Amino acid sequence: RFTDPKTLAHLLKYDSTFGVYNKKVESRDGAIVVDGREIKIIAERDPKNLPWGKLGXDVVIESTGVFSSATSDKGGYLDHVEAGAGAKKVILTAPAKDEIKTIXLGVXDHDINXDLKAVSNASCTTNCLAPLAKVLHESFGIEQGLMTTVHAYTNXQRILDLPHSDLRRARAAALSIIPTSTGAAKAVGLVLPELKGKLNGTSMRVPVPTGSIVDLTVQLKKKDVTKEEINSVLKKASETPELNGILGYTEDPXVSSDXKGNSH
């Protein structure tokens, strides 16, 4: 559904979770202007009709959640780079429904090459889980594991009870702990092939607007590993060039709201 520039400017300026944006934000015909920089607003139902080539756009971020297949009757993510749209590359901000290179920063970004037209950046939960699994596997070896993500509610749920194809997501998001499915654990095998088939997981949506957690339980190949050893390797990994800024480490007694605005 198309949203006008005035509404987009307002929602950027005033955010219920992160507060008021401290830069000047305004709207004009066909654009919003953020701190003096104009950002064009274009709305098309079919991605092949978007004028990326004319605008000189090299890389498109496909974050609608609608075009998760390369091609389909309603359009696909490759339409951004083929069929006339004219971009050179497309990055999905969600798992793809078909085979595509999946990249999690700090874990599999060495697999990116210039020949790829499209990559998936996986899900938020996979990006949380994969660096942790990578460090544990490289240090101690993972035989198998189970993950639970306790996740903030999202727009895929209902704010009040209302019909939804998933009867649990049909319930008011801010009033219940809502079990739901997740493919994040299995998707780790896409960015860490050596863990393919070794991890599984469940998800709980909880009544917070931001701040989620992954609880990972693993059976390690190395026996008698202590808590201190695990904490030590995670802390050291968080300070490496590979994972600095991606994996964080703290021993503070923090809660989910303390992660709000954290850039890792």
UniProtKB/Swiss-Prot annotation:
Residues involved in D-glyceraldehyde 3-phosphate binding: 123-125, 154, 169, 182-183, 205
Coiled coil: none
Molecular functions (GO terms): glyceraldehyde-3-phosphate dehydrogenase (NAD+) (phosphorylating) activity; NAD binding
SUPFAM superfamilies according to UniProt: Glyceraldehyde-3-phosphate dehydrogenase-like, C-terminal domain, NAD(P)-binding Rossmann-fold domains
Catalytic activity: D-glyceraldehyde 3-phosphate + phosphate + NAD(+) = (2R)-3-phospho-glyceroyl phosphate + NADH + H(+)
Site positions for Activates thiol group during catalysis: 151
Active site residues of this protein: 124
CDD domains: GAPDH_I_C, GAPDH_I_N
InterPro entries assigned to the protein according to its UniProt record, in alphabetical order: GlycerAld/Erythrose_P_DH, GlycerAld_3-P_DH_AS, GlycerAld_3-P_DH_cat, GlycerAld_3-P_DH_NAD(P)-bd, NAD(P)-bd_dom_sf
Binding annotation for NAD(+): 45, 93, 155
Keyword Nucleotide-binding applies: yes
Entry EC number(s): 1.2.1.12
Subcellular location as annotated: Cytoplasm
GO CC list: cytoplasm
Annotated region described as Disordered, given as residue ranges: 245-264
Biological process terms in GO annotation: glycolytic process
Pathway this chain belongs to: Carbohydrate degradation; glycolysis; pyruvate from D-glyceraldehyde 3-phosphate: step 1/5
Role summary: Catalyzes the oxidative phosphorylation of glyceraldehyde 3-phosphate (G3P) to 1,3-bisphosphoglycerate (BPG) using the cofactor NAD. The first reaction step involves the formation of a hemiacetal intermediate between G3P and a cysteine residue, and this hemiacetal intermediate is then oxidized to a thioester, with concomitant reduction of NAD to NADH. The reduced NADH is then exchanged with the second NAD, and the thioester is attacked by a nucleophilic inorganic phosphate to produce BPG.
Family in the record: Belongs to the glyceraldehyde-3-phosphate dehydrogenase family.
Subunit comment: Homotetramer.
Protein's name according to its UniProt entry: Glyceraldehyde-3-phosphate dehydrogenase
Species name: Borrelia hermsii
Organism ancestry: Bacteria, Pseudomonadati, Spirochaetota, Spirochaetia, Spirochaetales
